[in-house]
Amino acid sequence: MQADTPKGCFVAVVGPSGAGKDTIMDAARVALSGDMRFHFVRRIITRTQMPGTEDHDSLDEADFARAAGEGRFALHWQAHGLRYGLPKTLDDEIAGGAVVIANVSRRVLSDIRRLYTSRSVVVISARTEVLAQRLASRGRESREEIAARLAREVGFDDGSGDVVTIDNSGEVGASTKAFLHHLHEIAVKTIA
């Protein structure tokens, strides 16, 4: 192994709104608590904490721009009128041998593939009718907005060979089990 080869792995979790990414990641975080091989990244978002949303750190636009300019993010992007960032410290976790798991936008997959040689892209998906039902139950968007959102959804597998898809249309426990199985496989392969 070369000295500059990371010991750990970056696991990028992507998928459409309503697929259950946060639910599965939260369950996996609980199941893996205390296992130092795994590190779940807490995102930084230009949105204050609200009930029913992911647990994250908040920055206003000016502070976020300053942090980005100072290189404090490993990755950052803009989506749905908000800015998102992952702290630069995740690189230290990977260098130290951890499997680092983060919910990201498909917009940064090319950056992830360029920056992280040891990586896996996990697509959490669900059937369109399931996504529509879940989005409607949140009560944040009109029926028309949900239809427009679903019409914009695109595939995540671009043939790069690093994609694992988990269909979360059914029981979330089965999807979480599949996600945990994948994470354990990565840990066995990447951590000596």
Curated annotation (Swiss-Prot):
It catalyses: alpha-D-ribose 1,5-bisphosphate + ATP = 5-phospho-alpha-D-ribose 1-diphosphate + ADP. Keywords: ATP-binding, Nucleotide-binding, Transferase. SUPFAM superfamilies: P-loop containing nucleoside triphosphate hydrolases. ATP binds at G15, P16, S17, G18, A19, G20, K21, D22. InterPro entries: GK/Ca_channel_bsu, P-loop_NTPase, PhnN. One of its GO terms (biological process) is organic phosphonate metabolic process. The keyword tRNA processing does not apply. GO terms for cellular component: cytosol. The keyword Iron does not apply. Pathway: Metabolic intermediate biosynthesis; 5-phospho-alpha-D-ribose 1-diphosphate biosynthesis; 5-phospho-alpha-D-ribose 1-diphosphate from D-ribose 5-phosphate (route II): step 3/3. Its EC number is 2.7.4.23. GO terms for molecular function: ATP binding; ribose 1,5-bisphosphate phosphokinase activity. Catalyzes the phosphorylation of ribose 1,5-bisphosphate to 5-phospho-D-ribosyl alpha-1-diphosphate (PRPP). Belongs to the ribose 1,5-bisphosphokinase family. This is Ribose 1,5-bisphosphate phosphokinase PhnN. It comes from Brucella melitensis biotype 2 (strain ATCC 23457).
